[in-house]
């Protein structure tokens, strides 16, 4: 029997960065709530360009460790959790197969998220990876991860189980 899908790491932007894409794993629980029209859904996180990122429909970004591992092999370099600017690095869940409107419950404290859209890469993402043509390469691979909106606020921490409760 396969392990249950789970959160491998919760990643927050490095304080004082020019953009919010430089995210690093954090320890302990992080509060997640609907941010309104701008900002991140995770307490302590930041968004660099509020015109393109954040807000209720992009409150949380999830990306699978399995996809990071595939990119590691393709690019020939280590890709730590958070490198793609994801708030949640997951394991055991095909994030790319998630459907718009699909709902996930994380952990046991009632955090409920809804898949709102796939990621569309931006120039900052390409600059972060320092791979020429990265936006086109990433888009063509069709492994965008998922943006999520917050339906019910609650904490999230590394190790939390992810349950798909509505598809």
Summary of predicted features, one role per range:
Residues 128-140:
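Short beta-strand-turn/beta-hairpin segments enriched in glycine/proline and small hydrophobics
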Residues 106, 149-150, 160-161:
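A general structural signal for short secondary-structure boundary/capping elements
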Residues 101, 153, 157-159:
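Loop/turn positions that initiate beta-strands
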Residues 25, 140-144:
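Short, ordered beta-strand-loop transition motifs
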Residues 118, 151-153, 167:
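An acidic- and aromatic-residue-enriched active-site/binding cleft used to recognize and process polar
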Residues 1-126, 133:
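Electropositive, beta-rich accessory/interaction domains or terminal extensions
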Residues 90-92, 145-152:
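Short alpha-helix capping/helix-loop boundary micro-motifs
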Residues 158-167:
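A hydrophobic, small-residue-rich beta->alpha segment in the mid-to-C-terminal subdomain
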